[in-house]
């Protein structure tokens, strides 16, 4: 393959480049959008294929890339996509387009595409995981922790949204932009969402993570939310849940790093519908530095979505939940030919059916010894609101 990167002068909205049938990974307007498919490449071949692309770079520091999602269950085969057209926007304001082989791109035409207009549409929402089943699974995970088999396990449940006509992906992405602009918003082969959680970002030898664990709902009232945030910070249950995640990520990354630092205490990270405990980690990768995909596969799923110890938690999840998570709880993002990339935890998401008329939503919570099943149910309800409102809102 051959690639040609040239600068773009005019501003762009990556949501409009991706539309309803392209690829998107963006946060605060910075990220990438893709159109078409130059190749689908098995995960273990991605680094080699990207490095073999003959690339002319008129911008400087831009590399061919692949975008995709990695399923929750470790070792599940998957492919990343090398788009025929990639439009990118950096934090420093640089904008560019990369074309693979004979691909063409008309910026004016892309910018003039009409945005979807509000319209009436009928939806039904139904649980795929029965409430009693979910509560029983949470209790089983809690009892496993109390007995010493686990330190933590994450139990999730499914709901399905159905419409007589296809769900408008472009409209959903624009609603997510309005409500969750500072989350990592993504759209890849019918998998859409807005994740607040950075799994890993690598640029040169710099590495960053910002894991989240421990959650409380937002009410919309500033004073109530302030009290809830203080209670979240003071909650021993949520602090334990959070500490398990931080310790695992620290211990996993440290062998690759010459330097790794993290916040001594978690802070509260607020998004539109919930508040989380979050801890930022920053480090310097040792030479020879790993490809970001090596770090993604080493970290994912973190205890924020699986549990700890990992093998025992995944075994319990498989038995207790009663469904296959698929791409939920895995990782979503991009990697370039230099081995750099940004990946988020695949949460606050929906997976669309082939005809676009159904969306499967999944949400879960971390279970420790002090977890209460009804409180965990309420937490999943709060988390599901992110995608439910984006899909159903006219």
Predicted regions, residues:
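Structural signature of FAD isoalloxazine-binding scaffolds in flavoprotein oxidoreductases
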Residues: 76-99, 340-352
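A short, Trp-centered hydrophobic/proline-enriched beta-strand micro-motif
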Residues: 20-28, 65-67, 151-153, 181-187
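SIR2/sirtuin-family catalytic core signature
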Residues: 157, 162-208
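Short beta-strand elements
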Residues: 84-89, 196-216, 345-354
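Hydrophobic residues embedded in beta-strands of well-ordered beta-sheets
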Residues: 31-32, 85, 93-96, 191, ...
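Glycine-rich, N-terminal phosphate-binding loop and its surrounding beta-alpha-beta segment
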Residues: 24-90
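Conserved hydrophobic core element of enzyme catalytic domains
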Residues: 280-394
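Contiguous alpha-helical scaffold segments within structured protein domains
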Residues: 1-7, 22, 27-45, 102-139, ...
């Amino acid at each position: 393959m051959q690639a040609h990167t040239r600068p773009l002068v005019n501003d762009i909205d990556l949501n409009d480049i991706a539309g309803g049938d392209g690829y998107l990974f963006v946060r605060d307007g910075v990220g990438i959008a893709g159109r078409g498919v130059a190749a689908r490449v098995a995960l273990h071949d991605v680094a080699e294929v990207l490095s073999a692309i003959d690339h002319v770079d008129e911008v400087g520091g831009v590399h061919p890339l692949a975008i995709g999602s990695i399923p929750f269950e470790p070792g599940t085969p998957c492919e990343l996509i090398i788009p025929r057209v990639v439009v990118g926007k950096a934090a420093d304001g640089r904008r560019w387009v990369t074309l693979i082989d004979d691909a063409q791109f008309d910026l004016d035409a892309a910018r003039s595409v009409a945005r979807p207009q509000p319209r009436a549409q009928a939806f039904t929402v139904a649980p795929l995981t029965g409430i009693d089943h979910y509560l029983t699974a949470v209790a089983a995970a809690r009892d496993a922790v109390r007995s010493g088999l686990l330190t933590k396990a994450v139990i999730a449940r499914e709901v399905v949204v159905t419409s007589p006509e296809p769900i408008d992906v472009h409209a959903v992405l624009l609603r997510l932009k309005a409500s969750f602009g500072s989350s990592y918003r993504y759209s890849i082969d019918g998998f859409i969402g807005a994740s607040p959680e950075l799994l890993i970002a690598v640029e040169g030898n710099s590495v960053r993570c910002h894991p989240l664990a421990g959650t409380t709902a937002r009410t919309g009232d500033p004073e109530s939310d302030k009290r809830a945030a203080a209670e979240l910070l003071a909650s021993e249950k949520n602090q334990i849940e959070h500490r398990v995640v931080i310790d695992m990520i620290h211990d996993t990354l440290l062998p690759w790093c010459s330097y790794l630092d993290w916040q001594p205490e978690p802070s509260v990270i607020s998004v539109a519908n919930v508040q989380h405990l979050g801890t930022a980690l920053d480090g310097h990768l040792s030479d020879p530095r790993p490809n970001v995909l090596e770090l993604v596969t080493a970290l994912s799923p973190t205890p924020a979505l699986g549990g700890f110890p990992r093998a025992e938690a995944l075994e319990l999840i498989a038995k207790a939940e009663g469904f296959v998570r698929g791409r939920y709880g895995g990782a979503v993002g991009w990697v370039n030919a230099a081995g750099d990339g940004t990946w988020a935890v695949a949460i606050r998401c929906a997976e669309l059916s082939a005809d676009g008329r159904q969306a499967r939503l999944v949400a879960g919570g971390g279970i420790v010894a002090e977890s209460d099943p009804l409180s965990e149910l309420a937490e999943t309800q709060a988390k599901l609101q992110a995608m439910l409102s984006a899909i159903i809102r006219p």
